[in-house]
Amino acid sequence: MRLLAGAGLCLALAALALLAVALSTDHWYETDARRHRDRCRKPGGKRNDPGYMYTPGQHLPLRGEPPSSRIRSPRGGEPGGVRMISRAEDLGVRGLRERPTGARDLPLSRPYLATDPHCSRRFNSTVSGLWRKCHRDGFDKDTEELILKGIVERCTSVRYYYTSSSLPPNLSVNVTKTIRQDEWHALHLRRMTAGFIGMAVSIILFGWMVGVLGCCKQHDLMQYVAGLLFLMGGTCCIISLCTCVAGINFELSRYPRSIYSLPEEISHGYGWSMFCAWGGLGLTLLSGFLCTLAPSLSASQSAVHKPRQENGAV
């Protein structure tokens, strides 16, 4: 039926529009680091969310004393050669133990608890797509000032070729080799994502042209071929989107976690560009189903309405 074929072609055109929007925008994956940045700017940088507990200071590992202090006999009740790290000693107050006899005893300070190690790293609020990764507008005033001064670029292009990134010099050889292998794996996932979604758009566009010609010439076989092409394009789109999700999960679980993992305060998730791509996938599969169903319905109706020949008729 021409109505089903026309509806399938309209859905395929809408799917092409959604896929084009997804390809041309950068909101596939979004991160929001404002809550993490605000927490790290507070004094101490400690988390106060329910259910999170810091390790008490008395359970922290002990630090050995310098060799000069180990020669002296240990005090009573304290093992020789070890001492607790106190805030007074961190501030350089070394004369507490050699105070005069008549001096007033000072209260001992509590062991110093280090801040969150994630606060030593800078996390930005970003949006990323297939081609670019950009800083989100209005999420960080310091970054906005650097962008206005030209020190930091608003967007950086996503690389589809291998480049060795700079790594900390204190990493072991095995860790460095693992990071290099993970970079190759992430690069292959990005290439598969871009390649398969490009194939999907090309196949859907070609199928739409074949379907339009089939509707104009009332050729059922061309409409059937167009439906098969739509289903093939939807399959390529499924592979592309699944590979994109796998690539994002792989980036978040890379080793070592101290370099590639995100703190819990940073909210991250998929953006509206990803949902446009999934919507285009659904419309593509639906259009393929309608275009392959229309020729079979028209063939069955023509067989039912075919006039019966009388006996002796040629």
Curated annotation (Swiss-Prot):
Keyword Transcription regulation assigned: no
Chain intervals with Basic residues compositional bias: 36-45
Pfam families the record matches: Claudin_2
Region (Disordered), start-end ranges: 32-83
Residue ranges crossing the lipid bilayer per the database entry: 194-214, 228-248, 274-294
Keyword Signal part of the UniProt annotation: yes
Gene3D superfamilies assigned to the protein according to its UniProt record, in alphabetical order: 1.20.140.150
A cellular-component GO term for this protein: membrane
Subcellular location: Membrane
Signal sequence residues: 1-24
Keywords assigned: Membrane, Signal, Transmembrane, Transmembrane helix
Topological type in the membrane: Multi-pass membrane protein
Assigned protein family: Belongs to the TMEM178 family.
Name assigned to this protein: Transmembrane protein 178B
UniProt lineage: Eukaryota, Metazoa, Chordata, Craniata, Vertebrata
